[in-house]
Amino acid sequence: MKVKVTLSAVQFRSLVDYESRSFHLDLGEGSTLGDAVRAVEEMLSAEIEPLLERGNVRIMMNNSLVDYQKEKNRVLNDGDALIFITPISGG
């Protein structure tokens, strides 16, 4: 199964060049959101899960914000899109 990943979070700028920030992951059937995060961690040689757990990086899945702590065991489907973003606040 293929899942599209886009790394838009500021934290990834030093790890991947602009042209490489969007790519497809090949994952086995039944893979979860947590499996995808671990695959990206392995690919980048970086720890992403702690950033997600602290809320420094968030994931949008198919244009909806995901609570990683609650949904890391969510099973992915072929064609799902994951965007890693930096949360923005202000007023």
UniProtKB/Swiss-Prot annotation:
Coiled-coil intervals: none
Pfam families: ThiS
UniProt cross-references to InterPro entries, sorted A to Z: Beta-grasp_dom_sf, Mopterin_synth/thiamin_S_b, ThiS/MoaD-like
Family matches, as Gene3D superfamilies: 3.10.20.30
Origin: domain of life: Archaea
Name of the protein in its database record: Uncharacterized protein AF_0022
